[in-house]
From Swiss-Prot:
The keyword Acyltransferase does not apply. This is Delta-1 crystallin. It comes from the Eukaryota. One of its GO terms (molecular function) is structural constituent of eye lens.
Length: 466
């Protein structure tokens, strides 16, 4: 239990804090990850204090030396947290005083924990986004390069989980890659706002000591400084934005996972997961469970929950700082950890996935070419609605005869429309089917190749910006 003297603001209070209140108030377990960035921010602030003549050069050197020692202790895992340490900022302040004495107290001159916590979080998320972006771009690259290698594999495309049209396997892979590039772009947009520095905003009114905020920005490698001190210490838009982007990203990853789970079932058999990303059954020895994909799918719900939680926290608070904002770190750091793990697992799954080309070919049943039969008639001059009706009649006739549509005779087809001729046989080819979709974005080989090249160029640009 903290005594009066242990409290950071002990001079105002009499008596001790309820121990349960201390547990509720403490965020030290979550905030230990902020240790290094808090030290970086403190070093920058110390330099600004020296420039403002609040610290002498000797005092600055002592403070920087002490902070370097704390950083070293932290990296070695020997930085001790005490019961009175409410958060990482108070822990570092306490340890600095133990190392260099009362001079440590000067570091907080004109600085509030309100600005410290938001600065620390922004600094940490800045580096975290870079890591997440790297993993995301690697996943996109894996999808794109696999699409390039396996461009000649053709599979059924589905709508409503029912066979629709033949498509290239690569077209399927690229559909997910394209969605993920939008997530990569959104991460870049969030990073722009995260790199706006709030340090120098004080508790809410600003800094009264002529602190050079441009110096702080430069020292911490941020892009700009906040415009208004009240907004700076209270806004958590960047937390909501990052978790929102993560939510969309997890939706896309969940969709990819669900597709592959379906394709890996014995009923489909299109793909086989590597043993490294599968598990067995405790009772059924024949089973190979896609646990990696199921976990990716389920983690989406975890991220969605974090978004709802932080929105509810922010919805209920007034302007400036409130203790409610302590919830931001646990929410966003959990999302960061989830994304970091999920993206690496997803990349592992895609890079080791076995494609069962033969099973895909077997699933390319003739009814998939019914639309092509209609398009054949359209090219002969028949309006599309009439062509669809004629194609439907051909399907019905084949079913009545107990044969597949490609086994209908020319006479059978001519009984439906005189526009059918001997060249209709070319319709019943899955290669010819996919090759007619040459428009930009289509599943023809030329179009898929163009998509691959465009995505490679986009990846280069996004990698430079990550």
């Amino acid at each position: 239990m903290a005594t009066e003297g242990d409290k950071l603001l002990g001079g105002r209070f009499v008596g001790s804090t309820d121990p349960i209140m201390e547990i509720l108030s403490s965020s030290i377990s979550t905030e230990q990850r902020l240790t290094e960035v808090d030290i970086q921010a403190s070093m920058a602030y110390a330099k600004a204090l020296e420039k403002a003549s609040i610290l002498t050069k000797t005092e600055l050197e002592k403070i920087l030396s002490g902070l370097e020692k704390i950083s070293e202790e932290s990296s070695k895992g020997v930085l001790v947290m005490t019961q009175s340490d409410e958060d990482i900022q108070t822990a570092i302040e306490r340890r600095l005083k133990e190392l260099i004495g009362d001079i440590a107290g000067k570091l907080q001159t004109g600085r509030s924990r309100n600005e410290q916590v938001v600065t620390d979080l922004k600094l940490l998320l800045k580096s975290s986004i870079s890591v997440i972006s790297t993993h995301l771009l690697q996943l996109i690259k894996t999808l794109v390069e696999r699409a390039a290698i396996e461009i000649d594999i053709i599979m059924p495309g589905y709508t409503h989980l029912q066979k629709a049209l033949p498509i290239r396997w690569s077209q399927f892979l690229l559909s997910h890659a394209v969605a993920l590039t939008r997530d990569s772009e959104r991460l870049g947009e969030v990073k722009k706002r995260i790199t706006v520095l709030p340090l120098g905003s004080g508790a809410l009114a600003g800094n009264p000591l002529e602190i050079d905020r441009e110096l702080l920005r430069s020292e911490l490698d941020m892009t700009s400084i906040t415009l208004n001190s009240i907004d700076a210490i209270s806004e958590r838009d960047f937390v909501v934005e990052l978790i929102s982007v993560a939510t969309l990203l997890m939706i896309h990853l969940s969709k990819l996972a669900e597709d592959l789970i379906i394709f890996s079932t014995t009923e489909f058999g299109f793909v086989t997961l590597s043993d490294a990303y599968s598990t067995g059954s405790s009772l059924l020895p024949q089973k190979k469970n896609p646990d990696s994909l199921e976990l990716i799918r389920s983690k989406a719900g975890r991220v969605f929950g974090r978004l709802a939680a932080i929105l509810m926290v922010l919805k209920g608070i007034p302007s400036t700082f409130s203790k409610d904002l302590q919830e931001d770190k646990e929410a966003v750091l959990d999302v960061v950890d989830t994304l970091t793990a999920v993206l690496q697992v997803a990349t592992g799954v895609i890079s080791t996935l076995q494609v069962n080309k033969e099973n895909m070919e077997k699933a390319l049943t003739p009814e998939l070419l019914s639309t092509d039969l209609a398009l054949y008639l359209v090219r002969k001059g028949m309006p599309i609605r009439q062509a669809q009706t004629a194609s439907g009649k051909a399907v019905h006739l084949a079913e009545t005869k107990g044969i597949t549509i490609n086994n209908l005779t020319l006479e059978d087809l001519k009984s439906i429309s005189p526009l059918f001729a001997s060249d209709v046989s070319q319709v019943f080819s899955v290669v010819n089917s996919v090759e007619q979709y040459t428009a930009v974005g289509g599943t023809a080989k030329s179009s898929v190749t163009a998509q691959i090249e465009q995505l490679r160029e986009l990846l280069k640009k996004q990698k430079e910006q990550a």
